[in-house]
């Protein structure tokens, strides 16, 4: 799974059928299924189709009139695909846990973190395998400072706005279905984003314009 060979975000971008944007491309999906261990890709697609994924946006200025859902999608497009957002977007990626009474799962693709048990398991395994002389940063993060080696891949990329270096989390060491699912959604293409949020309406984008409700969201996650 070398970053020099494969640009995953470009493969994710081809997931929607070019001849019918209401369907996934079975060939690309089958190819990707073999590229990730533990049926990660299959579980990620199942998650995207489960109606258990939510994107909450702290919306201070949103106009409530008109088509609010489409406007929120435009906000995500500006933030993740066009880089034209005028201000830092505050958002949270949440997955509803299928176990009754379990807290919601918090996903952070910007820092490659997930609060699920699978992520914690592989993170601790990486810690145990780390030599005392090794820095955890070197074990889990691939740093590229040669511009000739820069990649256009956005999957598992940290701090994508840096112009001097590139950092990629070594996802082959730590990855879960939640991180992969949100990466497919937000690190691929506008077509893929709209496929799951608008066309199939399986991933929900919700605006919160009240700061108390926003803080309450975080309290519920912690609890």
Curated annotation (Swiss-Prot):
GO terms for biological process: DNA recombination; DNA repair. One of its GO terms (cellular component) is nucleus. Keywords: DNA damage, DNA recombination, DNA repair, Nucleus. It is found in: Nucleus. It comes from the Eukaryota. Component of the SHU complex composed of at least CSM2, PSY3, SHU1 and SHU2. Plays a role in a RAD51/RAD54-dependent homologous recombination repair (HRR) pathway to repair MMS-induced lesions during S-phase. Required for error-free repair of spontaneous and induced DNA lesions to protect the genome from mutation. Belongs to the SHU2 family. This is Suppressor of hydroxyurea sensitivity protein 2. It comes from Saccharomyces cerevisiae (strain FostersO).
């Amino acid at each position: 799974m070398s970053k020099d060979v494969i640009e995953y975000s470009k493969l994710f971008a081809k997931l929607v059928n070019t001849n019918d944007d209401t369907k996934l491309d079975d060939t690309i999906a089958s190819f990707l299924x073999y590229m990730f261990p533990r049926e990660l890709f299959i579980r990620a697609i199942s998650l995207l189709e489960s109606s258990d994924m939510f994107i909450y946006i702290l919306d201070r200025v949103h106009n409530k009139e008109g088509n609010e859902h489409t406007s929120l999608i435009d906000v995500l497009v500006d933030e993740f695909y066009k880089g034209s957002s005028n201000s830092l977007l505050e958002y949270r990626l949440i997955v509803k846990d299928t176990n009754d009474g379990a807290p919601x799962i918090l996903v952070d693709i910007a820092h490659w973190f997930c609060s699920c048990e699978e992520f914690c398991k592989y993170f601790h395994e990486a810690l145990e395998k780390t030599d005392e002389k090794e820095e955890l940063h070197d074990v889990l993060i691939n740093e590229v400072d040669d511009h000739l080696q820069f990649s256009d891949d956005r999957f598992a990329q940290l701090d994508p706005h840096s112009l001097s270096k590139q950092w990629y989390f070594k996802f082959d060491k730590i990855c879960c279905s939640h991180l992969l699912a949100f990466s497919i959604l937000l690190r691929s293409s506008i077509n893929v984003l709209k496929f799951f949020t608008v066309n199939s309406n399986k991933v929900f984008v919700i605006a919160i314009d009240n700061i108390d409700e926003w803080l309450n969201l975080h309290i519920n996650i912690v609890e």
